[in-house]
A protein has these predicted regions:
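Conserved "HGTGT" condensation-loop signature of ketosynthase/thiolase-family condensing enzymes
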Residues: 1-94
Length: 94
């Protein structure tokens, strides 16, 4: 069975942009987002580089209690989804 998919809105939380506009601008500039790992001590690890998402504040997208209960990857998903809903101009109350 084939289904058609329609993209109505976009959202992004990435190492090179915390929204679609910044992400796209940085792609055009050739920014890669890779740098030294800062989230934990890498002394005992061979890997020293990563593409970390920096400057993300979950409280901009959800209440502090919800943010505390979620892993960071889930916070990213919620934030990107909210941006996509706004971009699509969807009225979620309907």
């Amino acid at each position: 069975m084939r289904r058609r998919v329609v993209i109505t809105g976009m959202g992004a939380i990435t190492p090179i942009g915390l929204n679609v506009a910044d992400f796209w601008e940085n792609i055009k500039k050739g920014v890669h987002g890779i740098g030294p790992i800062t989230y934990f001590d890498t002394t005992d690890y061979k890997a020293k580089l990563a593409a970390e998402v920096k400057g993300f504040d979950a409280k901009q997208y959800m209440d502090p209690k919800s943010a505390r209960r979620m892993e960071q990857f889930s916070q990213f998903a919620v934030a990107a989804t909210k941006e996509a809903i706004e971009d699509a101009k969807l009225d979620m109350s309907k």
